[in-house]
Structures are given as structure tokens and as C-alpha cells.
Amino acid sequence: MTDITTWIDEYHKGSRFGLNGKILFKKTSKYQEIIVIENEYYGKALMLDGCWMTSLKDEKYYHECLVHPALSSIDEKSNVLIIGGGDGGTVRECVKYSKISKIDLVEIDEEVIKISKKFLKEIAGEAWNDKRLEIHIDDGVKWVEKTKDNFYDVIFIDCSDPSEFSNLLFSHSFYKECERILAPSGILATQSESPESFKNIHINILKSLKNIFKVSETMYSFVPIYPSGIWSWTFASSEDLSLSKQNYDEVVKIEKGCEIWNLNFQNAAFKMMPNKIVKELDS
């Protein structure tokens, strides 16, 4: 759009995280304001409604942590649902697995996909063309409601922070519907916000999943572009989770293509729950 550089900031409770660079794209879609900026250090970055979503520099911290703990523990052919994920990073990580039979990506805002393909094509690349992928421009909540019981083996909730059009993706009723459409041994994997910047939302997510599913586990790591830098991902199942019992040969293969995730990283990340979160969950 222009060669003039400017600061773009995300504000949160009296703090801010900003990037300085050239604005490559700016538009208000039916659902949200979309900005793409190019920064010297983080590369191209995507902001939705004033919140940083991803950047080329640190997106693998997020996408690898969301996908691989779940998919590396699945042994059989699987149907996968991605709710959100319009930047393509979750799709890219999913298509690394030959055992995935089908991927449904449900994104409410088609503009996010279009813009990501044009300005952030380094994220997903050819993954957009994988024959197993079907893209649906739809409301994720409504998609889940109309899906038959036990249909998906893995569900990824790759959504933005709570907002007017995404609040229901964090609700107890929505997680309950996800449990209904999962296969008996299926896994729900969701980004579960920051235990620091979004502590109350984080606690509510963990409590809901603990109440609905037989077992849930949360891992913590870093996404530098997000408020406070620390983030979380939670994995839940109606049967015993086997997140530490991966197929060794497959893990070795997947690790070679990852920048952040490996089994040692994962095992440590599942042991990083801050004690203040432990206390609130036990109260």
C-alpha cells in the first residue's frame, strides 16, 4: 500500500505490543478489520481487529504446538476438523501425516484465507492444494451443531481471541457439542489463551474441558508476538489420552520437519502449568 513505515499496536490492559513496518494490506471485512504489516524482524504479520494473529517469524511456535501432540498420538486413519485456521498454518502441519484421510477447514471469514494466500503464502504454501483438504466458509459453531455424532477423530480449534463473533467458540455448550461429534477415542485440541494476559478465559476453558471430557492436559510455550509471550494449548478426550505414547518412527520423521516441536519439548511443556493456575483449578 505504501513505503512509509508506521507502528501498529495491540493494546491489552494498559500494555501494548507493537510492530513497526510497511502496511501491505488493510481492509474491514464483514466480520473484522484485517491488517498485514511487514516488519524487519518478525517479517509479515497478520492482525485481526486489533489483535496479532501470526507472523512469519514465530508462527511455528503456535501451529506446531497445536497440531503435533494430537496427531502424533493417533494410530489409525483419521478425519480432521479445523475450526478457524484461515492463515493455513494448522493445515500445513496436518498434511504432514499420511494417516489423515480428510481435513475439513471451517473458516467464517473468507477474506482471511484470501489474504493469507496472497500475503502470507510462506505459511501454508502448497498445503492449500492438498487433495484431502476441503474449505468451508461457515460458522464453526453451526458446523459442529449440524455434524453427526462421532464423525471426527481430531478437532482443532484454531480461533482468534474472544470477540463478538467468536465468543461461542469458548463456551461450555460448544465444547460439549465437540465432544458429541468426536469418535470415542478422538482428541479435541484447542488454543487455550494465555495464563497471564487472559487468565480468566484460560481458567474457564480448562474447567469446561475438565468437566466435559474424561481427561484433559494443557501445555505451555511461547508465542512472542502474543500479549505476555506465554500461551497455552489444551488437549482433551473421552478416553485416556496417550500424548506420551507416540509412534516413535513417525515422531522422528515429523521432528525433522519442525522448527519448534519435538517430543522432549512437548513432554516438558506439559509440565509447565503455573502454580497459580493449579491452585485455581483445584479450588
Swiss-Prot record:
It catalyses: S-adenosyl 3-(methylsulfanyl)propylamine + putrescine = S-methyl-5'-thioadenosine + spermidine + H(+). GO terms for cellular component: cytoplasm. The keyword Cytoplasm applies. It is found in: Cytoplasm. It is an enzyme of class 2 (transferase). S-methyl-5'-thioadenosine binds at Q32, E107, D139, G140. Signal peptide: none annotated. Belongs to the spermidine/spermine synthase family. InterPro entries: PABS, PABS_CS, SAM-dependent_MTases_sf, Spermi_synthase, Spermidine_synt_N, Spermidine_synt_N_sf. Keywords: Cytoplasm, Polyamine biosynthesis, Spermidine biosynthesis, Transferase. The active site is at D158 (proton acceptor). Spermidine binds at H63, D87, D158, C159, S160, D161. Pfam families: Spermine_synt_N (PF17284), Spermine_synth (PF01564). Its EC number is 2.5.1.16. One of its GO terms (biological process) is spermidine biosynthetic process. Homodimer or homotetramer. This is Polyamine aminopropyltransferase.
